[in-house]
UniProtKB/Swiss-Prot annotation:
UniProt name for this protein: NAD-dependent protein deacetylase
GO cellular component: cytoplasm
Record-linked Pfam families: SIR2 (PF02146)
Domain of life, per lineage: Bacteria
InterPro entries noted in UniProt: DHS-like_NAD/FAD-binding_dom, NAD-dep_sirtuin_deacylases, Sirtuin, Sirtuin_cat_small_dom_sf, Sirtuin_class_U, Ssirtuin_cat_dom
Entry note: cofactor: Binds 1 zinc ion per subunit.
Any one Gene Ontology molecular-function term assigned to this protein's record: zinc ion binding
UniProt record similarity statement: Belongs to the sirtuin family. Class U subfamily.
Residue numbers binding Zn(2+): 126, 129, 146, 156
Organism: Bacillus subtilis (strain 168)
Length: 247
């Protein structure tokens, strides 16, 4: 514990990589764990693919909403782990969070520099005209459409595309992640098994940066624990509470 506090105290530029384990204590399931959305029915991956959306946009949305309806309710709240990262920023540290989660809880906790690698469930855009929409509009109808008016006054009416990165979409912000990593003095990995590319390569690449400290906080061991200076096998909310963090 004291070693971790010392590492945090010395760090001024922190890159954080978070996964599903970051939000499980907020009530959001880990999709890839036992009983998760993908492990229960692998065919769901096909329905959540870019190809499926492009081919059947009106069939896509009911399936998408069924799978993610709990997340779209907006009822989930940040846990102590999210709040800990926001607090580090308040202390004057540069904290850049790169999350594989789509729940928006880092922003809800108050963190300002959040890069959503897999997009956000809170927003969508029109593939035709680029108009953007937030959650209330997406929930108004089973299949959300663009309501923007064109130059001729006609309503666009195109089926919106979620900002969630679908299977077949490109993961976002990885160039920015490596730019920030080159400037950082601490890599903090939280709640991810590091099994999914390209995130799985980050710890190894960080090991090549002179002076970089690396800490992982994850309930289960990962294949690359040996690359880290400190390994903590604990839930992040529980660990944050042990540091005195309260909701």
């Amino acid at each position: 514990m004291e070693t971790f506090k010392s590492i945090l105290h010395e760090a001024q530029r922190i890159v954080v990589l978070t996964g599903a384990g970051m939000s499980t204590e907020s009530g959001i399931p880990d999709f890839r764990s036992a009983g998760g959305i993908w492990t229960e029915d692998a065919s769901r991956m096909e329905a959540m693919s870019l190809d499926y959306f492009l081919s059947y946009p009106r069939l896509f949305w009911p399936k998408f909403k069924e799978l993610f309806q709990m997340k779209m309710s907006g009822s989930f709240e940040p846990n102590e782990g999210h709040l800990l990262l926001a607090e580090l920023e308040k202390q004057g540290k540069q904290v850049d969070i790169f999350t594989q989660n789509i729940d928006g809880l880092h922003k809800k906790a108050g963190s300002r520099h959040v890069y959503e690698l897999h997009g956000s469930i809170q927003t969508a855009a029109c593939p035709a005209c680029g108009a953007r929409y937030d959650l209330p509009h997406l929930l108004e109808r089973e299949v959300p459409e663009c309501t923007a008016a064109g130059n001729n006054g006609d309503i666009c009416g195109t089926v919106l595309k979620t900002d969630v990165v679908l299977f077949g979409d490109a993961v976002m912000h990885f160039d920015t992640l490596y730019e920030k990593l080159d400037q950082a003095d601490l890599l903090l990995v939280i709640g991810t098994s590091l099994e999914v590319a390209p995130a799985r390569f980050v710890p190894e690449d960080a090991s090549l940066i002179p002076g970089m400290k690396k800490v992982i906080i994850n309930l289960e061991p990962t294949y690359c624990d040996s690359l880290f200076d400190m390994v903590i096998h604990q839930k992040i909310g529980e660990f944050a509470r042990s540091l005195g963090m309260k909701k």
